[in-house]
Amino acid sequence: MTAIPDWKLQLLARRRQEEAAVRGREKAERDRLSQMPAWKRGILERRRAKLGLPPGEGSPVPGNAEAGPPDPDESAVLLEAIGPVHQNRFIQQERQRQQQQQQQQRNEVLGDRKAGPLEVLERRSSPGNLRDQSPKGRESREERLSPRESRDRRLVIGGAQESSSRSLRDWRQSPAEARDLSSRPAEAQKWRLSPGETPEESLRLAGSGDDSPKRKEVLESILSPGEPGDQKASPTDVHKWNLDSREPQKQSLIQLEATEWRLKSGEERKDYLEGCGREEEKLSSGIVPVTKEVQDITSSEVETAEQRPTESWKWTLNSGKARERTTWDIDTQTQKPDPPASSEKHPGPSGMEAEEEAEKEEAEAQSRPLRAQQNLCSGPSPLPPEHSGTEGSRQQEEEAAEPRPPTPAPLSPPPSAPTAPQPSGDPLMSRLFYGVKPGPGVGAPRRSGHTFTVNPRRCAPPASPAPPVNPATADAAGSGSGKKRYPTAEEILVLGGYLRLSRSCLVKGSPERHHKQLKISFSETALETTYQYPSESSVLEDLGPEPETPIAPLATQPDEEEEEEEEEEELLLQPGLQGGLRTKALIVDESCRR
């Protein structure tokens, strides 16, 4: 006897899982019916009576079909080998079922109210179809049905006020049903607001997502427009939809995200304020908006904010990290400039655009002699705090150039600082460069890629033409100055190579400073002897057939052209000398024009 194939075992296991799920749903349905109030049971009984079902029958479940004799097609389906797709019995049954459902949906849209009971009876005659059907096909059919059902339900709820006298009589039978009618508009609003919930709600109205064909057809026949009174749900159902709806969850999630974002920004601001040393400025709570921070600033900040209201408004509108330089800091710098304190107050990075706007407003508010000082002193350093020492020394240097009481000596002056003039006090230079922020150090490169530094001290030294110097002084000057220096044309004497290799462009910089660099060495005697070119006269004596005719060296191009013309005339006049003259002319042309 052959072993059972794997696909058949998988099919049997899937069928067992489906049966277990169906049994669980049956149990849940029975529990729900036992806990249901009497008025709702009466509504369900009236629905069954309209559909033509016996009134005493319980909830239609597929377990009743399982108790009967097995379907004759079932054994054939399980024993059949999987052949081509179009001949598979599962595929054929699924196609028939889909065609029936599409036809039924068309009938529902057209208002055919008799399709529901006929379909119920048809499905009850062949209950084995449900078990042959795979769960994926069932889920896809439910998803196909649910948007149309939701649309039909919306239409029915919209026309619920124009109900017939029969449905009004049904509602008058119990006052609790009249109360239930009042919950209709809220449900309609929920269905319109959240279309993603329509599959779950359509299944819940049928009863806890039951997959039985009778229950589905009950639900579909409910949706006919003439019976709006039958679609009222119990308050428990309304309560379930309220609990299970995703809109309050979405709103609460949005609120949580908003509070998290505010808390995060508040924590960042608090960390920054503690790092800057201004701990007296506390945030009242993590959800304080950014524009309310003006109320927390100290009294001196309030005064300066009154002096410049637009500037303080701009700073408070920026984020917590960009709001580093307050108006109080700018005022203290302009009134009593203390460079080390200002450099300590601005250790962190800042927004470049906000700084430029603030500096423009400062330049308009203050007088001209203070512009250069503000541009050089009030700009916060974008480098980490370890560079604040060099910034402080640079500001001390600039203030020492102005007529002020002497400050302590600079800590680490750059090498080019003593020789370069300092036109920082010039109002013309400050007017030119007031929009550009100077760098953190005099010679240090800027690390931000969006702004460039214009230092006016670089272009100030006068250009004095230096006389040709000897190699020793050239080397000393090259090693003394900080930048790279190339030798001039007067300093180089070429004899097939450079006299000193340290002055050639093969060596980048002087070898005295770069000890680890590659050292290149040639033997100068070999270069001198090897690359010595022979004279043209000797070459012509070796190659030319007539050495008795001397050839003068051609100095310039016009002389060469004149001689060529003369040679052409000689060729025309003396045809006997054509060969020798032509050979020598070619040799001269090749040697000179290269």
Curated annotation (Swiss-Prot):
Gene Ontology annotations for the cellular component aspect, listed alphabetically: cytoplasm; cytoskeleton
Molecular-function annotations in GO: actin binding; phosphatase binding
Feature: compositional bias, Acidic residues: 353-364, 558-571
Compositional bias (Pro residues): 403-421
Main subcellular location: cytoplasm
UniProt-annotated location(s): Cytoplasm, Cytoskeleton
Modified residues (N6-acetyllysine): K437
Quaternary structure and interacting proteins, as annotated: Interacts with Protein phosphatase 1 (PP1).
Job of this protein: May target protein phosphatase 1 to F-actin cytoskeleton.
Descriptive protein name: Phostensin
Protein species of origin: Mus musculus (Mouse)
Lineage summary: Eukaryota, Metazoa, Chordata, Craniata, Vertebrata
